Amino acid sequence: GRKQPDGAIQILASIQEPSASFIRKGRINNLNKMTSCATLIKDKLEKTLKKTISGCYVGVGGMGMHTVENTVVRHFPDKMLITNEVVDGIRDNNLQSQPGEREILEAVQQEYKLGAQTQLDPVGIQAEGIEGHFLNIVTNRRVREDIYTCFREAGLQVIDLPITFLALADQMLTGPEKRSGCVFVDMGAETTSVAVFKNNLLRHLAVIPLGGDNITRDIASLQIEHREAEQLKREYGKAYYEADDESHAPISLEDGRSVKYDDFSGLVQARL
């Protein structure tokens, strides 16, 4: 894509390749197949654009990603002015609190507590001590390592690893929604991602290993092939359906059978 002066992205080319056999619940489980897929996409894009591609942005998410609260405390012998250096040191200390086999992908700054007052920006305030509160987004260390390995083998430098779900929330949520408080839910890629915002800050994030594929499997329980169930879900599935709505005709299946729309929608709505 090409970034426009107003910040919008102009799509120059788009390539899609199936990945269900080696990416499960947002995690790579076969590095060789992932590398081959990335190489194929790179080659096709270069052929379409007639340009060499050397770097890429890779959205990260998937099962196991969640937030962990952390507090960093600093006490001073006397009341002192909080400087940028003090705040930077607190942030660095927070990033050093890597929790075991997990790593911090992003540290979301919450409030700072200085005595009895709470501030978003403590610089310039005198205090005898300061508490920095952080919400760390963590995931398994292998997630980043596997992504870098696959794309390096495909001849691509990973420029950045934005958290896909948060990038989507930033585009879809308004400022007033984040200020007043809201829950943002995204279902897809065999997972359901949930984020809570309040006072313009992320307050909680979790990725649940249940998603759209579970709906597809429920539909397949009507003796329908998984491929056809996925197609029907995309075409007819609704998050909300009123059972007394008689305007929908039965859904025709490839084998000549038909399914009542009520039965189909009941399966979809039960998951949502």
What kind of region is each of these model predictions?
Residues S180-S221:
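Glycine-rich phosphate-binding loop of actin/hexokinase-like ATP-binding domains
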Residues R2-V183, L201-R203, G212, E225-R227, ...:
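Nucleotide/phosphate-binding catalytic cleft detector across ATP-hydrolyzing
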